[in-house]
């Protein structure tokens, strides 16, 4: 699913980081969600998605309205206009 989205080297590095049994840390995934969920509502809303790149680097650009809406549509499985943790996992 990430092939073509992430560089092969990045995918390999991520997989190598959790190759050993019991090395996957689900808390890291929760931290990722919490970082993007700036208002700690338990959901990632449109404005938080717009600033998604800036969670990685303060100098990064904001996503365009079209990019933000496409991102939201891809992750909003129940059509409520926001992405919950369960929806993110299912996306």
From Swiss-Prot:
Modified residues (N-acetylalanine): 1
InterPro entries listed in its UniProt record: EF-hand-dom_pair, EF_Hand_1_Ca_BS, EF_hand_dom, Parvalbumin
Species this chain originates from: Merluccius gayi
Membership in a protein family: Belongs to the parvalbumin family.
One Gene Ontology cellular component annotation held by this UniProt entry: cytoplasm
Keyword check for Phosphoprotein: no
Binding residues annotated for Ca(2+) 2, in chain numbering: 76, 78, 80
Keywords: Acetylation, Allergen, Calcium, Metal-binding, Muscle protein, Repeat
Molecular-function GO terms, alphabetical: calcium ion binding
Gene3D superfamilies on file: EF-hand
Name used for this protein in its record: Parvalbumin beta 4
Domain of life from the UniProt record: Eukaryota
Role summary: In muscle, parvalbumin is thought to be involved in relaxation after contraction. It binds two calcium ions.
General remark: Is regarded as an important allergen.
Residues the entry annotates as binding Ca(2+) 1: 37, 39, 41, 43, 45, 48
Domain EF-hand: 24-59, 63-91
């Amino acid at each position: 699913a990430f092939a073509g989205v992430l560089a092969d080297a990045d995918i390999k590095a991520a997989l190598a980081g959790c190759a050993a049994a019991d090395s996957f840390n689900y808390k890291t995934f929760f931290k990722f969600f919490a970082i993007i969920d700036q208002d700690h509502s338990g959901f990632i809303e449109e404005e938080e998605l717009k600033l998604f790149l800036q969670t990685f680097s303060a100098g990064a650009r904001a996503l365009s309205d079209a990019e933000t809406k496409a991102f939201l549509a891809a992750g909003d499985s129940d059509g409520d206009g926001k992405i919950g943790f369960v929806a993110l996992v299912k996306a």
